[in-house]
């Protein structure tokens, strides 16, 4: 949850300036209480500019993020037309097969979401249960790869979507071979993650570090 909070807010954990979420379960509160101030998100930006947003997730801890930007806790929309305070239009927590099916339905509709956040829990669940890089973990990687294929194929099959959609694939942590957790910050495998971008305007073969030399 700390790194997912960073993904959607663009902020580090540590305050001041960060989102202040060190815990990995829904504590029943909201991100703004953790930070000590309102924390804007990618959902705020899209929603307040008239777009639609969705979260399709595989763990109940994401209720924390949905609650943080709901109709009660989201900030007033002060950009153009007032679209209300609920920054996340669709929130679904279920297994990956169900959430991916829902996403594919959205992509095929006449009004697909402007922004979709998709969390696939299969690899994480397998890593914690059977060990990272175990046979069960690698099987889960294959399953998730299949889900990604379905999503990318659905976008590529629609010319308008293909021309206007960018996909970012990443994860919130890694995991060392044979280990069941990722708690040791001194182990590079725990914090080494993929960051892949796909879309019409994405430079093929570009290196993330070369593109961001000052980061």
Where are these regions (language model features)?
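Solvent-exposed loop/turn segments at secondary-structure junctions
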Residues: 1, 12-14, 53, 59-64, ...
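Active-site nucleophile/metal-coordination loop of metallo-enzymes that catalyze phosphate/sulfate
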Residues: 1-44, 48
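Structural recognition of the beta-strand scaffold that forms the well-ordered cores
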Residues: 6-8, 42-45, 52-57, 64-66, ...
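Substrate-binding rim/cap in mid-to-C-terminal beta-strand-loop elements of soluble/periplasmic
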Residues: 8, 185-215
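Second-shell loop/turn segments in exported
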Residues: 26-34, 43, 88-93, 105, ...
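A substrate-binding/cap region within the structured catalytic cores of diverse enzymes
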Residues: 30-103, 108
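Active-site His/acidic residue clusters
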Residues: 66-84, 104-150
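Metal-dependent active-site segment of extracytoplasmic phospho-/sulfohydrolases and closely related
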Residues: 143-185, 195
């Amino acid at each position: 949850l700390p790194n997912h909070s960073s993904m959607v807010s663009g902020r580090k954990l540590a305050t001041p300036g960060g989102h202040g979420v060190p815990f990995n379960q829904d504590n029943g509160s909201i991100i703004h209480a953790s930070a000590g101030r309102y924390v804007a998100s990618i959902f705020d930006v899209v929603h307040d500019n008239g777009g639609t947003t969705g979260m399709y997730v595989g763990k109940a801890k994401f209720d924390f993020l949905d609650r943080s930007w709901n109709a009660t806790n989201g900030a007033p929309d002060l950009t153009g037309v007032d679209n209300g305070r609920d920054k996340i239009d669709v929130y679904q927590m279920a297994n990956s097969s169900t959430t991916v099916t829902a996403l594919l339905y959205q992509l095929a509709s006449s009004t697909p979401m402007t922004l979709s956040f998709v969390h696939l829990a299969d690899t994480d669940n397998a890593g914690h249960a059977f060990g990272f890089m175990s046979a069960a973990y690698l099987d889960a990687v294959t399953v998730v790869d299949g889900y990604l294929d379905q999503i990318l194929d659905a976008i590529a099959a629609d010319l308008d979507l293909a021309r206007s959609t960018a996909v970012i694939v990443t994860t919130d942590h890694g995991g060392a071979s044979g280990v069941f957790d990722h708690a040791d910050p001194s182990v590079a495998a725990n914090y080494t993650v993929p960051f892949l971008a796909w879309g019409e305007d994405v430079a093929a073969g570009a290196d993330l570090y070369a593109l961001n030399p000052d980061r």
